[in-house]
Amino acid sequence: MYSTQEKASRLMADISRGRHFVMEGSMSSFHAPFDPLFDLAVYLLADTQIRMVRIQQRAKARFGDRVLPGGDLYEGHQKFLDAAARYDTDGSPNQRAHQMWAESLPCPVLQLRGEDSPAENLKQVLHAYEKVVREPRCGDHMEGPRWS
């Protein structure tokens, strides 16, 4: 396990090697140095039931029987599922914290619905990204609401 500072340092070293990067997942504990670097943020919000099914499918595909009863990852996976099920209410990190972070970003934030197909969401991301690359640096031109 890496400390918060180690995570940020290692990640910054990796992304500084290229001109562009894609960041995926929650960065709740170490986002600050990266926030000014984002040109576009994508916030995917899925209904609890849909999210839980997808998490279980992804874990099974990635880790196989290791996440099933008797597997070496079973206990940890169950703890993760418990936290994920509480995301909309009192889980940590929770939906409210992520929304507050997204609202504080100096770039456009595209909100996607988990109920939409991956193909539809990809289409929206590509459209938003094309718009961003044609405009000045995101932090220099944003005004008004950023949730779309």
Enumerate the predicted regions with their spans.
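A glycine- and Lys/Arg-enriched "phosphate-lid" helix/loop adjacent to the NTP-binding pocket
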Residues: 45-94
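Short glycine-/acidic-enriched loop or helix-start segments at secondary-structure transitions
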Residues: 31-34, 53, 121-122
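Soluble or luminal CAZymes and related metallo-dependent hydrolases
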Residues: 3-10, 22, 76, 90-94, ...
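Short beta->alpha linker loops
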Residues: 25-26, 46-47, 75, 113-117
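NTP-dependent small-molecule kinase module
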Residues: 82-148
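Glycine-rich, phosphate-binding/catalytic loops in enzymes
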Residues: 38-41, 58-61, 128-129
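Glycine-rich phosphate-binding loop used to anchor ATP phosphates in small-molecule kinases
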Residues: 3-48
